[in-house]
Amino acid sequence: AGDLDGIVGIYDVHAYPGRRQVLSGDFRKSLVSMKSNVPSGSRIVLGEAGYKYQGDPADSLYWNEYIRRCEGHPYTKGSDCNMLVYDYFYALDMPFLAMEAMNGGFSGIAAWMLDDAMHTNGDSGRPEDLKIWGMWNILGEEVFGDASQEEIRPWYYTWSLICRYFPSGSSILKVVSDECCGFTAAAAVKDGKMSVALVNCNEEQLNVNLNLPRALENAVMFSFNRPGKVSESVAPSNGCLKMSVPAESLILLTEMEND
């Protein structure tokens, strides 16, 4: 990478790690290693990111479920898909991945992908080669005869929260925490306004002592819980918070305005 310094404007990696790899913290270590090879002053992003489950025995249940959903599927052969994008847990896994990228020193992440209808395997254009990766399928009824595919999937709600309240130009704050598989936290500041996000992918509630650089001012708290919708409430205003993060949930505290 050093030989390309001054030629490359930004470094870009496409990554599809496994679930265990991300939730255990191992993928963050890989990101830190990649970032260390980027010349000082240059930036690196995950220009394409999602999850794939084959190859890791710890992810075998997810891989087997992927295969089961592909078999006899009415409008895709399942080639280059993630058939689990419909599921609630994926709505936690994707912001978890984004927050690991932040904490790993990366400057951005782009989720693959917005809409199933955007892309077919090999660019064939054939419905049976559809890549199911999106937040919805805008052509669900029109092309595939299934209007339910046009419904917004749970991970849209959490991903949009991360995009809105960790916007471009934010400064990522260093987060120091005890290692806990299935839990991550990230914080950022832009224009003097702070955001903090917590994700708990575990099946048990976690109690967290949150020590912020300063007290939050006029902050809002967003919570994402089952069955898969976001609720909004007034956030606590002090800088040292004792919080309970429910099982399988996301909590986001922000001073940024909801534009």
Explain the meaning of each model-derived region.
Residues 9-12, 43-48, 108-112, 195-198:
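Structural recognition of the beta-strand scaffold that forms the well-ordered cores
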Residues 51-160, 164, 170-183:
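Aromatic/acidic polysaccharide-binding cleft in carbohydrate-active enzymes
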Residues 235-259:
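C-terminal beta-strand-rich structural cap/linker in extracellular carbohydrate-active enzymes
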